């Protein structure tokens, strides 16, 4: 039976794990709704991936305005695609302005989250404990760097580090740099070091389709214009429409997809050496992997005399460099592992335990999945932000977050009305997964190996239009939910401090 209110009932609380953009968006929503919450952050500052990644040449890979909180616009981006430090500075500035810091416990990594007695119980790496009614996992999926299992890696005599842990104490000039990896970070680091005159060797196993883009500075008039009455909202609507229509080629074959493929081939035509061009030409179609963005003309950079592209697998690390699978050796002073992240980890390595002692590791042992990117059966009152099947590539980040958070808030209130904790049913989750599986054929994300794919070859991102994502999350269907007893105090309705919707400023 649902719990009944009592004099000793604990106040309704939410714990958010992660103080990146998603966690902070959720914080503002809860704050306005009058719901008590605490954010646990393993690092010493907000920002998430923008705090962690500081490597040379890092620019946002989508338009700067796609990383704005809708309730706190920034009219003064320096460029169309802002440098990473500017994104991070905006997040910090907004967090201070909005008063979020008072809710955050920094240097507090949650290592265990367990649902028991109708509530979530948390333990930090320091041994501290906490209890809350709702658990929001806002950890993201680009937080656990992958270091390749290459023999001899620890024997290298010089500095070596992952791109997400870039060591800025290492002098850039006068070093022979080795960049292992050809994804977004590998491309941006290579071109940044190349134009500084460094000796750079990039080791790639697979070529990428690379977007050579222009990144102009924002003019004073553009900044002034956004401040005119009604102009910002108009420009945002135009931007969302442009993104949604412009990304339609990802969802189905047709002339738009053919035109995009042709455009990217023209970028490659800038490489004049036939042998180098062959190394840099992918053997799969455009969009199957995430498309690296080049702000400093990668194809021009790799044709500089100080840059070398080596195609193949690194077989061994030696104290003075690397050895390839074909036996060739390359002497290096510094190695950067631009080898990406464990994108299927999500909130792990945290141990998360739901009903009947079942852990997230057991549930995700064979396949990574969720209900609509926000919930999992068997884990009452645990909600994910940008979980499996989230709209990573075809919905603007603020829009996707508002849609997810809107659904989560409705689910929380539905549970509180019944004195219960809620989770999606197994049937609703399987129905959702069937819809996702049916939609993937014909999209660009099938047909090659990429980090979007689960163990059965199904991509775990949103394969439909933006409006369908909004429609899915716009209404709460109680028949899709399981209600389980919550602890005393979980009943009632929050008294809003401000407008309940975070984007209504």
Predicted regions and their residues:
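Beta1-alpha1 glycine-rich phosphate/pyrophosphate-binding loop at the start
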Residues: 12, 16-101, 204-205, 270-275
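Alpha/beta-hydrolase fold catalytic core
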Residues: 258-331
